[in-house]
A protein has these predicted regions:
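Periplasmic OmpA/Pal-like peptidoglycan-binding modules at the C-termini of bacterial envelope proteins
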Residues: 3-6, 30, 34, 38-40, ...
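Periplasmic peptidoglycan-binding/tethering modules of Gram-negative envelope proteins
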Residues: 3-79, 153
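Short, surface-exposed beta-strand segments enriched in small/polar/acidic residues
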Residues: 44-45, 63-100, 120-132
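Structural preference for long, well-ordered alpha-helical segments within the folded cores
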Residues: 62, 69, 105-112
């Protein structure tokens, strides 16, 4: 027979699912991050003489290698920063201007090798970003440079 007791309906709690669209595809972001890190590891620093912004003869092979690395890469979605740096000699204003001239010099050399200027952000740190802080000629020489940074857009 039938029992007098009615079965209580099972209460199922609905969970609200919220989908957040960040406008970015995670796989593409991860691949872009991986490529940015790889490129940054392959690009070499360009060094400069005291108070100069022209590419030295001994740095031309470095620029050639950097041009090959950048020219062979899919830079879509990436920004390439050319970071000009100086030693501590000279005023802050002078060194910021010199650092920018160094970054432009590297950009122009890469352009001459067929790497597009649209892919570059030029920045000067002047003397504010030293890799060496000793007060020696060899240390100062290390600070006269253009570094590369590759970052996702």
């Amino acid at each position: 027979g039938c029992s007098q007791k009615k079965a209580e309906p099972e209460v199922v709690k609905k969970e609200e699912v919220v989908v957040v669209d960040t406008g970015r595809d995670n796989f593409i972001d991860m691949e872009r991050d991986r490529l940015a890190k790889q490129l940054k590891g392959e690009l070499q620093t360009v060094k400069f003489d005291f108070d100069k912004f022209n590419i030295r003869k001994d740095m031309q092979p470095v620029v050639d290698t950097d041009a090959r690395v950048l020219g062979g890469a899919n830079l879509s979605g990436l920004n390439v920063k050319l970071e000009g740096n100086c030693d501590e000699w000279g005023s802050d204003e002078y060194n910021y201007a010199l650092g920018l001239k160094r970054a432009k010099s590297v950009r122009d050399a890469l352009n001459a090798k067929g790497v597009s200027a649209n892919d570059f952000i030029l920045i000067s740190y002047g003397e504010s970003n030293p890799v060496c802080t000793e007060h020696t000629k060899s240390c100062w020489a290390q600070n006269r440079r253009v570094d590369f940074d590759v970052i996702p857009q």
